[in-house]
Amino acid sequence: MNLSITFGKAMNKALAVSLIVMALASFGSASAAAPVAASDKLTQVRMSIDEDPIVLRLADSLGYLKREGIEIVPVDLEQLTKQDYLMQEPLTKGQIDASYHWFNHTIFGARHELPIKAVMVINDAPGMTVMVANRVKDKIRSAADFKGKNIADGAQYGTKAVITSYLAKKAGVPPSAFTPVMLESEGRLEAVLRGLKEGKVDVMTFQEPVTSALLESNMVSTLYDLNSKASTTKVLGAAFPAQSLLMSPKYIEAHPDTVQHLVNALVRTMRFVNAHTAEEIAERLPADYFDKKDRLKEIKLIRNTLPSYAKGDYSFSPSAVKLVVDAIQASDFDKSEEGQWRATGENSKVKADRLYDNRFVHKAMQAIK
């Protein structure tokens, strides 16, 4: 069976749940911790997936998953836990086998005694741009000038806000010294554009496609480029692991062969991504990836986000992991339920070298050139 990997936050929930039900019906109960061998000899891996990533879609459409004997079954986390950001407990309980999500979730898990590990990095840069309104760019030349400014950087539990605050703190400016604005996700681009015209926003931290839309307005300029490993290292001192493949230590120990085969498939996929243009990548994505989407806009999005993908090396460096840990531990987050989940727990339980396992990706990178 060839499952289309389409579950994500932007996807219609009813359709997502329907897909999961069909998947589980095809393979039987997915409640056991061990992977299940399907009738066509593919090993089922139950995975929670953030958005609709091209890497998993390509791994499927290019045949790399099948080549490694792997079948990914998307799982709706909200059927297992109250929020889709709480993947640590289902992972540690064996309700799911893997999660395609941001590396920082390993830190939150460690804080709450729900240990998970990252076994491969997909994006080694956050894919963000810190921008300054042109009307004040002569006054805001670095994060040291954030004091007293209005800053739009999304929800205050999110990574955009974490990185903005980290830059400010490193420059000696506490988060309390500037004002977060335009926090609502719905209609955010329109709100920021309006705020720029009205002089109500000074600094912005966003990802694509919002970044391009703001830059194309000619009302903002780039202050910090965090879209590639090189540019991120220049700003923050190291790469910043973002989307990664996450698993529980128990699953890794119990099913090393499955982990290796899955990592092999994703390393092959990353080699493909690294070697092709956005247009070439789009040609190899399944047709339904573009359902209800503007194809040209999607290709532009792929093109603009390609720099954030790890190139050649998909392992975790101690310096990169330390950077994410430092940024998270320096963040106050907000008072929302998700913010408090991320803020609470014990920092002393976070051991950076226990947040990742490079064995599988090192082996795959050596074998797959």
Predicted regions, residues:
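Bacterial N-terminal signal peptides that target proteins for export
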Residues: 3-17
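Secondary-structure end/capping motifs
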Residues: 253-337
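Bacterial N-terminal signal peptides
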Residues: 16-26
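Short, solvent-exposed loop/beta-turn-alpha elements that line the ligand-binding surface or hinge
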Residues: 67, 227-238, 304-318
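Pocket-lining segment of extracytoplasmic ligand-binding domains
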Residues: 188-288
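Signal peptide processing junction and immediate N-terminal pro/mature segment
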Residues: 27-35
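Short, glycine-/small- and polar/acidic-enriched structural segments
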Residues: 34-184, 188, 202-208, 219, ...
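Conserved C-terminal helix/tail region of periplasmic/extracytoplasmic solute-binding proteins
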Residues: 325-369
